[in-house]
């Protein structure tokens, strides 16, 4: 397992420290490149690498040929034939802070003599994305694809030709008039997020191990010894560089190279630009950062390359990287820290969630001190204990989570987590149903923690939209026992609000105005605001549309609720239990008392027309050859069928297209008839 500077005491002997760093970095490289089982966060690796570089800079006599600083890193796996690259596949130096980019631009400008003029002449750079995948080289001879190899250690890689041949985005024959005799295309094999999710759905359906992330999935798929397995994996490719070129002149700029690649039929990413100077580089970086989470694939930074080929040649290379390029990496999304305690939080519905209390660590652009552990089963599965050194992940707006513990660093006094039997907030008992992963406090609205969360949910924009009722105000209202249920909100007055801490008179009046406005809502919003487990906005709208008014919903049996579009057994039972609880009915009556919350009510939705599928439940999954899912749904409903969202024993038919996933496996397990699109059409025509 991984060891870092934290597990090896600092020493005054640079030689000893350098030797340990080299061994640790090589071990991490082997785990990452050969085993495809990375166990050291990128940020930790970068920190160790920079420390070794610093030691070798101060003590040049300690540099040895096999130091990680003198090569790219990694070894060819024994299961594939080695391929020696005619031109090395080098890695890039990294920059992290804006200052690093300004310094890079200055170094380039100085070396090219552009900073000597007055005013300085800005350097043109090609800026593009840094994909989180696997680097490969494709060789084409007279336009025909003949070989593919991984980067390996930069000098020798692995022959993965047959596997790469299965990647549909990679042309087996180049097109266009300008096809060279020999061309080595450098690029990245990756897996799009949507394809990764579908792959894991298939893995789950087949009861096989799921992949941790798209990069691991891409790497594992590319290095399959059986290319038939690779062919079933949804891999993609983007070209971004060049190795050997024979039979024509090298394009004058990097941007022209990528334009030429597009002419040849090679996939080139469109998120690229030619920019000038450090200001242009940073503008591109921050622009990409704003839309990073919305991109359909994972990236871990951007890459800058001097655009002109002659200037690249003039700048040349250092031992392991080109001087004309730099990778500008986003803040690390994973980091190491110590787990000092595990507490539990109580959610709006009483869910008890273990929360890791951490030594502060900077990850994903923010300092993290808490991270979710999801539930008791996850803590057990990952074998996470108090006192462990853990890997923490934070990406974008996602809640930080503990990924795993480093078992080789576990202290002797590490303690296992014990789920409490009583709620830490109200003292009520904690229960966990046999078929659920979540334990829950049974205190209901008696529990202040649930009370606060329930009020916060009630006030959300998509619920009753009570502007100005934030968490701090709710905390005071609950802690001072001024509000116990949502109905109490409409009883508070100006004097009460004005006395709250840091709550000005204007704020008090604004909140009262917002409460008055919230009294006029819709049935769907009101249902959603109640915070019924498993009832989101869509289900609330379906309930309102189906029943037309609140009383029929409150009195509906589970069987009646199952007739609502997309309501399955679990949701129906949750709704039924909520309205069966007398306390909930009391709160609802208080809310719709005269002068309180009102909404327009109407008749229930008309019964589905009788047809050949009247009374039948059908589930759609996958992609149909000629029909969009909504079209198929409309056809089935027009024939009287209920189109459900999940497969159960009550499902009469499953209509399955391509990439059917777990619903198909569930249907086969339950013996539900499975139809393709043609079968569905025959069913609609009454031929089945």
Curated annotation (Swiss-Prot):
Its cofactor is Mg(2+); Mn(2+). Coiled coil: none annotated. Zn(2+) binds at residues 423, 426, 441, 447. It is an enzyme of class 6 (ligase). It comes from the Bacteria. It catalyses: NAD(+) + (deoxyribonucleotide)n-3'-hydroxyl + 5'-phospho-(deoxyribonucleotide)m = (deoxyribonucleotide)n+m + AMP + beta-nicotinamide D-nucleotide. The active site is at residue 130. One of its GO terms (cellular component) is cytosol. One of its GO terms (molecular function) is metal ion binding. PANTHER family: CHROMOSOME TRANSMISSION FIDELITY FACTOR 18, DNA LIGASE. DNA ligase that catalyzes the formation of phosphodiester linkages between 5'-phosphoryl and 3'-hydroxyl groups in double-stranded DNA using NAD as a coenzyme and as the energy source for the reaction. It is essential for DNA replication and repair of damaged DNA. This is DNA ligase. It comes from Paraburkholderia phytofirmans (strain DSM 17436 / LMG 22146 / PsJN).
């Amino acid at each position: 397992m991984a060891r870092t500077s934290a597990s090896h005491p600092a020493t005054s002997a640079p030689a000893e420290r350098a030797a340990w760093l080299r061994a640790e970095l090589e071990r991490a490289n082997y785990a990452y490149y050969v085993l495809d089982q990375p166990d050291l966060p990128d940020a930790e690796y970068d920190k160790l690498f920079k420390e070794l570089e610093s030691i070798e800079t101060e003590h040049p006599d300690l540099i040895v040929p096999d130091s990680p600083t003198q090569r790219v890193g990694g070894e060819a796996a024994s299961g594939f034939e080695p391929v020696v690259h005619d031109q090395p596949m080098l890695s890039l130096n990294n920059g992290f802070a804006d200052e690093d980019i300004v310094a890079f631009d200055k170094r380039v400008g100085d070396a090219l003599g552009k900073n000597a003029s007055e005013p300085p002449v800005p350097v043109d750079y090609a800026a593009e994305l840094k994909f989180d995948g696997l680097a490969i080289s494709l060789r084409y001879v007279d336009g025909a694809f003949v070989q593919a190899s991984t980067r390996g250690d930069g000098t020798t890689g692995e022959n993965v030709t047959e596997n790469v041949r299965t990647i549909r985005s990679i042309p087996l024959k180049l097109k266009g008039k300008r096809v060279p005799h020999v061309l080595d295309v450098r690029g990245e094999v990756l897996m799009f997020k949507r394809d990764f999710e579908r792959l894991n759905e298939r893995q789950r359906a087949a009861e096989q191990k799921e992949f941790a992330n798209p990069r691991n999935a891409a790497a594992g798929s590319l290095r399959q010894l059986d290319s038939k397995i690779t062919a079933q994996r949804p891999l993609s490719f983007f070209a971004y560089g060049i190795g050997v070129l024979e039979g024509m002149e090298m394009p004058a700029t990097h941007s022209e190279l990528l334009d030429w690649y597009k002419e040849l039929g090679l996939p080139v990413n469109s998120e690229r630009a030619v920019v000038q100077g450090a200001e242009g580089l940073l503008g591109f970086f921050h622009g990409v950062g704003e839309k990073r989470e919305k991109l359909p694939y994972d990236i871990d930074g951007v890459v800058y390359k001097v655009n002109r080929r002659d200037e690249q040649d003039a700048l040349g290379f250092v031992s392991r990287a080109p001087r004309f390029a730099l990778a500008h990496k986003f803040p690390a999304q994973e980091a190491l820290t110590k787990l000092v305690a595990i507490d539990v939080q109580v959610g709006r519905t009483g869910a008890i969630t273990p929360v890791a209390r951490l030594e502060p660590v900077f990850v994903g652009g923010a300092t993290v001190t808490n991270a979710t552990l999801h539930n008791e089963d996850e803590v057990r599965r990952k074998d996470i204990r108090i006192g462990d050194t853990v890997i923490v992940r934070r990406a974008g707006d996602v809640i930080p989570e503990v990924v795993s513990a480093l078992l080789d660093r576990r202290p002797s006094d590490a303690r296992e987590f014990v789920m409490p039997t009583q709620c830490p907030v109200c003292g009520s008992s904690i229960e966990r149903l046999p078929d659920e992963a979540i334990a829950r406090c049974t205190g209901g609205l008696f529990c202040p923690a649930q009370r606060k969360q329930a009020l916060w949910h009630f006030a959300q924009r998509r619920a009753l939209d009570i502007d100005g009722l934030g968490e701090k105000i709710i905390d005071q209202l609950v802690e001072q026992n001024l509000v116990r249920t949502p109905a109490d909100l409409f009883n508070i007055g100006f004097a009460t609000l004005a006395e709250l801490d840091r709550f000005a008179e204007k704020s008090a009046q604004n909140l009262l105005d917002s409460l008055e406005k919230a009294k006029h809502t819709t049935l769907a919003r009101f249902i959603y605001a109640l915070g019924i487990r498993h009832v989101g906005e869509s289900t609330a709208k379906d309930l309102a549309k189906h029943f037309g008014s609140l009383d029929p919903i409150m009195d509906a049996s589970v069987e009646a609720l199952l007739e609502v579009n997309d309501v399955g057994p679990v949701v129906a039972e949750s709704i039924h239990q909520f309205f069966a609880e007398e306390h909930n009915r009391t709160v609802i009556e208080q809310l719709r008392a005269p002068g309180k919350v009102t909404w327009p009510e109407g008749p229930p939705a008309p019964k589905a027309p009788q047809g050949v599928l009247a009374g039948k439940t059908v589930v759609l999954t996958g992609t149909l050859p000629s029909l969009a899912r909504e079209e198929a749904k409309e056809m089935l409903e027009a024939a009287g069928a209920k189109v459900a969202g999940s497969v159960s024993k009550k499902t009469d038919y499953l209509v399955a297209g391509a990439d059917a996933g777990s619903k198909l496996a569930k249907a086969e397990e339950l013996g539900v008839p499975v139809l393709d699109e043609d079968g569905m059409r025959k069913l609609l025509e009454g031929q089945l």
